[in-house]
Amino acid sequence: MNDMYAALRGNVGMLGHLLGKTIKEHLGDEFLDKIENIRQLAKSSRQGNEEDRQKLITTLKNLSDDELLPVARAFSQFLNLANVAEQFHSMSRQGELHTTLDPLDSLFDKLKNANLSEQEIIDTVCELDIELVLTAHPTEVTRRTLIHKHVQLNECLEELELQDLTPRECKFIQHRIEQLVNQSWHTNEIREQRPTPVDEAKWGFAVIENNLWPAIPLFLRQLDDRLQENFGIRLPLRAHPVRIASWMGGDRDGNPFVTAKVTQEVLLLSRWVAINLFLTDIQELVSELSMTDCNEELRQRVGECSEPYRAILRVVRDSLRETQQAVTAKLQGQYTENRDLITRTEQLREPLELCYRSLQSCGMSIIADGMLLDVLRKLACFGVNLLKLDIRQDGERHGQVLSELTQYLELGDYAEWRETEKQEFLLKELASRRPLLPANWQPSAESQEVVDTCRVIAQTDPDAFGIYIISMARQPSDVLAVQLLLKEVGCKFHMPIAPLFETQNDLQNAAAVLNRLLSVEWYRNYIRGQQYVMIGYSDSAKDAGMMSAGWAQYRAMEDLVAIAEREDLKLTLFHGRGGTIGRGGGPAHQAILSQPPGSLKGGFRVTEQGEMIRFKFGLPEVAIHNFKLYTSAVLEANLLPPPKPEAAWYDVMDKLSEISCQHYRSIVRDEPDFVPYFRAATPEMELGKLPLGSRPSKRKPNGGVESLRAIPWIFAWTQNRLMLPSWLGAHVALQAVMDEGKEDLLKEMDQQWPFFHTRLEMLEMVFLKADLWLAEYYDLRLAPENLWPLGKRLRQELQDSINVVLQLLPKRGELLDDQPWIKESIKLRNPYTDPLNVLQVELLHRSRATPDEVNPQVDQALMVTIAGIAAGMRNTG
């Protein structure tokens, strides 16, 4: 055991002891002994003791119905507490953030040694535009009630780390920790009802209020300090290197519960939260800025008064209060007069910047650069709308509206027209001054919903929105259709529209679609030199396998960047990544640096999904660290871009992509036993019972694997520890290339090409979380005997995959030898995750044995094991 993790293990041990004490008080000594016996058997099993492994299986098989839920809860709660301890450790004085070089320091050291002009560095920093898009993907299984308790636990651990605590203070904090552990144990960890889209949006607002709101100014102070220390420059007052956007309340793709009314409510709530936060800050500034000296500009504004800063800020405060009252009234459905309200960010910025200039010119820079500067920076990042709301809709839905409309107007059926005919019609109507929508036209409910959403956009402040994303975009007409619908409802601003390319085929055609769009003069005038394109990671990986999808994404980005350079466009690529490797997840810093050269010049936009929001932004200190990782990676990619890959590397990747895709599809699509095996050997069918997000798990209720969303697809394979979507196909391709005598070339690619190196590193992480004996146990206990050969084949492929990757990676004795922190983290969890897996198998067996009977104890325990394994894996989908 590594001594550097002694503090982590100490906190895990303390929290585990307190949980044990709580369980003992609630359920008695005998039950606690049973839990401890299961834990010891799991630990011994993990060390290879076959006899104890069988004892573990037998013990969990023999649990009575009454014991199922408390056993599941004990191990699930322990894993949640381990996550709390780990998140605290990562930012504690003994943790990773304090014992490794700060990402910004590391970057600036590199920049100072590079052959770059100071102006080049200044310009790149000032143009930095990173947009983190919070999404409501249903992968956060931990209840928000418990998340709040976990945050309080973290605060207690932080206090305990202080060196000068008195024994009384120490005892008080430890007592509070014990209270919180007790509260967690006596709280149901599974929410009883699915959250509504508005609930999801409110959770997003809470993340901003509690974590990102305090983190942004602290992060920008640190960035500003580094710039001054290294280059003698200041961050501009209006700079916003990091901004926040959201899909919560705007993403209606496959979610019938996100309606135009919901979007309107979320927009108002977002504004209310922003106004409330700024109101608190302005009130504090009124208290702070009691100075009497001011410049002539401010004096002319406020007249002869002894406290000019307070005078102007009180006016701002009163306007904010009035605005908040008006927004509250709107939310309650009441009519409000158009009073002098704060509706634009500039209305708030102008008086604050006036105060800032005055303080600076009167020799009070130290005061100007205090809280006032922090508020100005929050304003640059969040604005008076708090965040930018994206709208996402399936491309077919826009076509459906136009199809109904053209039939009503007796022009034919838009859906049956050729692409050229669609474009001709759309461009003609876009250029026309007369309205297309008849006043008395009554479309279907689905089409009316699309039109109503466009009306909400048209009637709202443009700054409240991010971009409009079209899922499954395949033709220029998909984009032009949205532009026409927005025009027809009176939208006066140019809403940025991004086609989303999701499948492997769509990614391969992305450049052709963009080329065709740019050949349309009307479209070029509309976009005004700025093009957004979204790259889908989840569905492309589900469609073609991780390795092939990764290469399709890379080539698509390269082609799109080449078009942008040729056409002199600012191209912003929007990355739809998930939390897991199989959905494009993985360490952010490496992922950014592995993108094609030039792909970050137009900014960086990425989704932050589900439980990853909590892991990356769940505490202000952790959020600051992740802001630094993103910032340093994007700056490095733009200022020190990786070299263009060698021609030989392209050839190898083309081959790897082709072989891995063929193999992946030969199993997932063509193997007749695959779907029955998937349904039997994973809890996929049972996942629908878990009230995670507001969105249904399938696009089409009666569809098979192809209609399953990427999240439950990944979630199911993560639960049974086979982790199949993240590796299937890769090893066959790698082995084929090695058999051609190109092993040294693969090793060269690993050492010199960030894209390929990141692929192998992500595979390593997946392999360490996968588990062959547990995957086998799911098969033998749950799948019919005729499906066992397929399971055996897949497990052998997993083992072959591990062997191939270890052969390619230099000087590796074991997986992740060069990343001890991740390795220790996974090792710490296994003795608690393994019993949940074994218990889950037993619960699935009991549930499926009597499908017509409802057993609340079994169902509830099953839900807890699903949540617990997700906590143990530290990701779901």
Swiss-Prot record:
Q: Which residues form the active site?
A: 137, 542
A Gene Ontology BP annotation from the UniProt entry: carbon fixation
Membrane-spanning ranges: none
In Pfam terms, one family for this protein is PEPcase
Which reaction is recorded as catalysed by this protein?
oxaloacetate + phosphate = phosphoenolpyruvate + hydrogencarbonate
Tell me the SUPFAM superfamilies matching this sequence: Phosphoenolpyruvate/pyruvate domain
Name the coenzymes or cofactors required: Mg(2+)
Q: This chain belongs to which protein, by name?
A: Phosphoenolpyruvate carboxylase
Origin species: Tolumonas auensis (strain DSM 9187 / NBRC 110442 / TA 4)
Gene (UniProt): ppc
